[in-house]
Regions:
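C-terminal structured "cap/appendage" subdomains that terminate the fold
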Residues: 130-200
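An acidic, gly/pro-interrupted, aromatic-rich
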Residues: 1-137, 186-217
Length: 217
């Protein structure tokens, strides 16, 4: 590990994008939200309101720790599959599938930027970044949590500039700030600087949406 932290000296196979379930689990685990309970009934995490009405059914979203269970416990309706996981090529389960199709579409990036699960995970990471003595250490640690890799100097410089730019914007636009910090059930500490948390969350979201996070190499 000391000689090859990035695992570049030993080839282990071709690059492969993580499945939708893995990407969601990684976001929850990295932010510390993941509920590790094993077994039990299916759960109903965040999904767009009214999606089940097409079949005259009602989707009652769960609350608390149930929102953060592993993706394998997400309730599955074959006629209306969970949109977040389906966007990342999860099969419909109406027929047997030997191998998943793997696509790369703009919708996948939009999911990672706008789905409440990922915004909430980014916001929690943004809150945790406040505990570090400086932004460099906060961003480097968050990058490591999400990607399992050591951040490069040029990557760190880009994210530092992004954090500074977003912080300035959030300080001037409190409504935009509230849009970030109020997404999801996890509560913000009342003493936290909401503009700083939101700016940190944008950085975490950017890392979460990067190829290095969602692709295994």
């Amino acid at each position: 590990l000391e000689k090859d932290k990035e695992n570049r000296l030993l080839a282990r196979g071709p690059s492969k994008r993580l499945t939708g379930e893995m990407i969601r689990n990684n976001a929850l685990e990295s932010s510390g939200l993941l509920n590790r309970t094993i077994g039990g009934e299916s759960v109903k995490p965040y999904q767009p309101e009214g999606l089940w009405r097409v079949n005259n059914a009602t989707y009652e979203q769960d609350t608390g720790d149930k929102l953060y269970r592993r993706s394998m416990y997400t309730i599955w309706k074959r006629s209306v599959p969970h949109p977040t996981i389906a966007t990342f090529d999860a099969p419909s389960r109406s027929v047997c599938t030997i191998r998943r199709q793997e696509t790369n579409t703009p919708l996948q990036a939009l999911v990672l930027m706008n789905d409440p699960t990922y915004i909430e995970a980014a916001r929690v990471l943004g809150m945790k970044m406040l505990a570090f003595p400086n932004q460099k250490e906060a961003i480097a640690t968050t990058f490591r949590l999400l990607t399992g890799k050591v951040i490069l100097p040029r990557e760190l410089d880009i994210l530092l500039a992004l954090q500074k730019e977003e912080h300035n914007k959030f300080q001037k636009n409190i409504d935009k700030t509230k849009g970030w910090i109020n997404t999801g059930e996890f509560k913000l500490n009342s003493s936290d600087d909401i503009a700083l948390v939101a700016a940190n969350a944008v950085v975490a979201s950017t890392i979460m949406n990067s190829d290095v996070t969602i692709t295994k190499r």
